[in-house]
Amino acid sequence: MKKKLLSITLCLTMVVAMLSGCKTQKEPTNGENVSTEAPKATDKPVDTATPAPEPFEITLGIWPEDTLPDDIKLHEGYVETFNTTHPNVEVVPAYYKYATDTFVPLAESGKLPTIFESWYTEPQKLIAGDFVADITDILQERGWLDAINPAIKELLSKDGRIYGIPRDGYALGLMLNVELFEEAGLVDANGYPLYPKTWTELAETAKKIKDATGQAGLCLLAKDGAGGWHFSTIAWAFGATLTLDNGDGTFTANVNTPEAISAMEFVKSLKWEYDVLTPDPTNEDWGSGFVNLGTGTAAMYIAANDAVNQPTQVNGLPVDKLSLCPLPAGPNGDQFSLLGGTPYFFSKDATKEQINAALDYLEIMGKAPVATDAAIAGMRADAQNRVNNGVPVIPRFPCWIDEQVLAAEKQIITEFGNVDTKLYDSYYDATTTEGNLRMEEPGSAQDLYAELTKVLQAVITDKNADVASLMEKANTNYQTILDGLKK
């Protein structure tokens, strides 16, 4: 029951906040006189140094990957600003993309970055493993503790202590390559894509696109756990609940229900009846999905508002040829958007001084619950970098509840908006509707996704695969994992 209340609280809070941030934007500025580098800070971040500060370093797992040179330049501007108030701190770039198979070895070797990102499914695992620092007292001293969305704070806490802060949130939707919709003639009189409202319509739309363009209608993931992650949203639309919370710290696998089986049968039909998928979904992962969408080899892909840079900046899709719409509804009209997000964590080996320095860096980035001149400068620099790189400047899901921060973000979106908001309105309309947002399944979501991906791989590669038997096996395997959680 506690988890249900948490989910409801989080969803309602998101809805209220998003309603204030999704209005139609004015025409974008040309950006000619706006620097892409972070301006000098006007407000000095919290000074935790002693009168004669000892030198130390912080390693930034949040540093951009090498393939994003403009993002690196943006961070170099942040570092320049940071150095004006932290001359004794050396900033060491240490890009790290969280993955369940690399994290534990990295943590056990003592090589975790000072600050790094993860997923909202992971906090309790990281806390239980003693991999991340307790930052409760530090946040209290900075006045940040009560600025976090209460429901998100609970996700990042254990026994009243908090171990992380939010970067942002997301809600899964359906990304569209508008160029392929145009080529297939699937646009309305005003040129906007005719996106599918139901999963059956998605299959039919995907078939029309493949017949007209020769490209895949949908990129389905079936290589790793991301496949099961995406499938869970399809299953919900078909009426499934994949894990039951027993309310006593135990969970029951619910993968073998008629609703879940029906959803998997539908996915199987996308391959063997409609034939609308990319050549080998078992080689498709989160990143390759954006490659397909951005380069025009797939017309639709399940993705979220926090990843609009992937098809555009990373893979070359023009900023005005991307659209984001709601996930389709199921046979009974059920329609949900999986709600997740990215938290920041800090290595358990980091000192208080290192953690405070990393938090100061987040403030300069504009990722803190403050609306200082330094923070707003960081927000503006980030928005200008998006404009320069053809990335949509659109509202994010708010994880902080400070009104000044929310107002500053809204103003920046209005100032730097660079897309036709009608390409995104349906997504925001859906995700700000009460009851639409749904938290990831309780229990052990990543293990659930892994089991579901095994089934996806089977039904995609074997036309005669017995879906019911495969789902029964997945249910048994997942229940074994759930039973071990309390041991």
Residue ranges: model-predicted function:
Residues 4-8, 22-129, 140-146, 188, ...:
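Conserved N-terminal structural module of periplasmic/extracytoplasmic solute-binding proteins
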Residues 17-21:
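C-terminal motif of bacterial Sec signal peptides marking the signal peptidase cleavage site
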Residues 50, 133-148, 191-195, 240-264, ...:
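Short, solvent-exposed loop/beta-turn-alpha elements that line the ligand-binding surface or hinge
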Residues 89, 107-118, 131-133, 214-216, ...:
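Alpha-to-beta junction loops
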Residues 94-102, 197-201, 280-295:
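Short helix-initiation/N-cap motifs at beta->coil->alpha
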Residues 119-182, 197, 201-205, 213, ...:
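Hinge/lid segment of periplasmic solute-binding proteins
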Residues 201-208, 249-281, 323, 327-330:
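Glycine-centered hinge/linker elements that transmit conformational signals in sensory
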Residues 307-317, 333-338, 345-450:
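C-terminal lobe and pocket-closing loops
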